[in-house]
Amino acid sequence: MCGIAGFCSLKRCYTDRQSFWENILVSMHEKLIHRGGDASGIYLTPHAGLSHQRLSIRDITHGAQPMIRHRDGADYAIVYNGEIYNTDELIPELTSAGYNFLTTSDTEVILYAYMHFGASFVSRLNGIFSFSIWDGAAKQLFLYRDRVGTKPLFYHAKDGELVFASEPKALFCFPDLSPAITENSLRELLAVGPARTPGCGVFQDIYEVLPGHYLCFDAMGLSDTTYWDLKCLPHTDSYEDTVAHVSFLMRDTVKRQMISDVPVCTFLSGGIDSSIVTALAAAYQREHGEVLNTFSFDFTENDIYFQSNSFQPERDLPYVNCMLEHCKTSHTYLECTQETLADMLYAAVDAKDMPGMTDVDASLLYFCSLVKKQNKVTLTGECACLLYTSPSPRD
């Protein structure tokens, strides 16, 4: 993941105090260093500033951000967090339209697609993303978020000024913007948490761009456009057609997400979701003469204290080992002690900027910090139960 941040105002001229506002942009990406750490950059114009903290995945050498391109004397700039999986479909169309690609990064594809197709181009993207584009010709700043909200994007808008960031903590680097909670904030944390009401940023006057939406900020103010929405329709396919369709989508999804300029691994719990992802990823790696790295996690002494329940009748380990025998991956078993878990609790809250699922967040943060030493990209079975409406196995 990367971290993005920035601000925009058509009433203020940021370059009148250039060093001051450049320092603000630097402070914003420094707050997001845990989201990247490979590189950082800023971009400042009279009416907009962009800041980026990079985790390099695609075109490690030439994909630096903010990325700026020029047309008819105007700047077009982007800061982007995410992955686009259909660049192979977009590049030929853009190339034939006369766009000259200087990198192999998906960042450049997004920026050129905006310049060519306009603001609604986002409906053409297949991927997970949050990004901001400054259109120097139209004097407009756009904020985009992917269809299901995989990548976060928070913002504050007041008195003709917009501030945005991947995490709330970076917003509070902006002058006169400080964290405060309200009665509604407490309702969110105590009644809804660890989830949130869609669009709610918990802190006072902080909001989150809705999944499947994009915002446009200009002289007319802030507008919100829905480019995609989940529809509830009767399922009319036969059982056989459903199996074939889901199989195609899973294979296509994993294949597209294996494309990276850095090693890709999977998390393997032995459950249905992670096992399917791992099996498909391992097959892809074998086709390319490589072995997939996999990781599983457990708590120290869980073999002694584990108690069966209806949600988890057995430990993960036997199922993990079964999948390892089937997939022939290069596997690493990771453990977390109770002491380490306790030490990570505050770090987990700081990473989310608010209370979450305590031991779940803390252990995941710890395990991910270990995995990152070997792999920057991992595929997991997260959220499959949400898409299929239940965490329990079904026929």
Q: Can you say where each PLM-predicted feature lies in the sequence?
A:
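Conserved small/polar residues in nucleotide/adenosyl-binding loops
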Residues: 388-395
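Long, Lys/Arg- and hydrophobic-enriched amphipathic alpha-helices
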Residues: 352-360
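Active-site nucleotide-sugar/metal-binding loop of Leloir-type enzymes
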Residues: 371-372
